[in-house]
Amino acid sequence: MELILLEKVANLGNLGDKVKVKAGYGRNFLLPFGKATVANAANLAAFEERRAELEKAAADRKSSAESRAAQLAELEVTITATAGDEGKLFGSIGTHDIADALTASGVEVAKAEVRLPNGTIRQVGEYDVAVHLHSDVEATVRVVVVAA
């Protein structure tokens, strides 16, 4: 299936690239989420007319993500959780908890933007958490987990 990308897609291509993908990936992900359109003559002409508008929107999203990353770089978030004597948490701190704490401190962050590659946090301590704001912009936030 040949598609024209309407925005940058990780591990696939940039805005305006003509890519060949498997039918399921195109039909179930790229087309429904508005990330691509079918590559035919009519859509190619329509894309070229809208190209400047799409590039400006992509640049606006990236600049917004960069400004949020600058705010996040200065931030240190403290999360209080119940823990045992040895610092092991009763439960865990996940992406949702971190996103809520960041939003409460003044920077709007969605749960899907928080990356915990080693899984949820289960110990008291300080952690550096990656926040993936845009395909080109990633920020690191210091999260301090303290026992209640």
Swiss-Prot record:
Keyword Ribonucleoprotein: yes
Keywords (A to Z) from UniProt: Ribonucleoprotein, Ribosomal protein, RNA-binding, rRNA-binding
Superkingdom assignment: Bacteria
A Pfam family this chain is assigned to: Ribosomal_L9_N
One of the protein's GO biological processes: translation
InterPro entries recorded: Ribosomal_bL9, Ribosomal_bL9/RNase_H1_N, Ribosomal_bL9_bac/chp, Ribosomal_bL9_C, Ribosomal_bL9_C_sf, Ribosomal_bL9_N, Ribosomal_bL9_N_sf
Gene3D superfamilies: Ribosomal protein L9, C-terminal domain (3.10.430.100), Ribosomal protein L9, N-terminal domain (3.40.5.10)
One Gene Ontology MF term: structural constituent of ribosome
One annotated Gene Ontology cellular component of this protein: ribonucleoprotein complex
Function: Binds to the 23S rRNA.
Family membership: Belongs to the bacterial ribosomal protein bL9 family.
Identification of the protein by name: Large ribosomal subunit protein bL9
